[in-house]
Amino acid sequence: MTEEEKTKSEAEEIEQNNKEEEQEKSVEELLEEKEQEIQQYKDKLQRIHADFENFKKRSIKEKQEFVKFANEGLILKVLEAYEDLERALEVKEDKNLREGVELIYKKLTKILEDEGVEPIETKNQKFDPYKHEALMTEDNDDYENNEIIQDLQKGYTLNSKVIRYSKVKVCKK
């Protein structure tokens, strides 16, 4: 083998090695790109999974809230009868009638309490527009400004949510 052939052969070998290195680099680059792509898909899947879990929790909470207040309309109707019984109890003439009405009143009171219904307190309270509806105002020296003078119609909450505002007379100075 001549010197020229030897040099030519070495040059071909170097060129072949360069091609192999380029192919290795392109395979490595391709592999790295695919690994990055896989990581992006994993991240996306993780976000979607977290979003779905949050959606499930929110749906459960909304369902619980719906169930909690589903009886609101019925309770508002029962409250009217409940208050009629309250007024009937104020009549003290017929003892047997009164005892029967008291029994019904106590049962209704227990039912409403068990369902989460509570009357809104107005005695010695300041007017709160989130709980009370002012139907009348009066300048009265016996009360402070914005203090409730009289409860004209009871208000109620269902599980701490106002379902009927107390209708009140308020002191305004």
From Swiss-Prot:
Basic and acidic residues bias locations: 1-28
Molecular function terms, GO-annotated: adenyl-nucleotide exchange factor activity; protein homodimerization activity; protein-folding chaperone binding; unfolded protein binding
Region (Disordered): 1-30
A Pfam family recorded for this sequence: GrpE
The entry's keywords: Chaperone, Cytoplasm, Stress response
Biological role stated in the UniProt entry: Participates actively in the response to hyperosmotic and heat shock by preventing the aggregation of stress-denatured proteins, in association with DnaK and GrpE. It is the nucleotide exchange factor for DnaK and may function as a thermosensor. Unfolded proteins bind initially to DnaJ; upon interaction with the DnaJ-bound protein, DnaK hydrolyzes its bound ATP, resulting in the formation of a stable complex. GrpE releases ADP from DnaK; ATP binding to DnaK triggers the release of the substrate protein, thus completing the reaction cycle.
PROSITE patterns found in the cross-reference section: GRPE
First-listed, main subcellular location of the protein, grouped into a coarse class: cytoplasm
Oligomeric and partner information: Homodimer.
Span of the signal peptide: none
Protein name: Protein GrpE
Family the UniProt entry places it in: Belongs to the GrpE family.
Organism per entry: Methanosphaera stadtmanae (strain ATCC 43021 / DSM 3091 / JCM 11832 / MCB-3)
Domain of life: Archaea
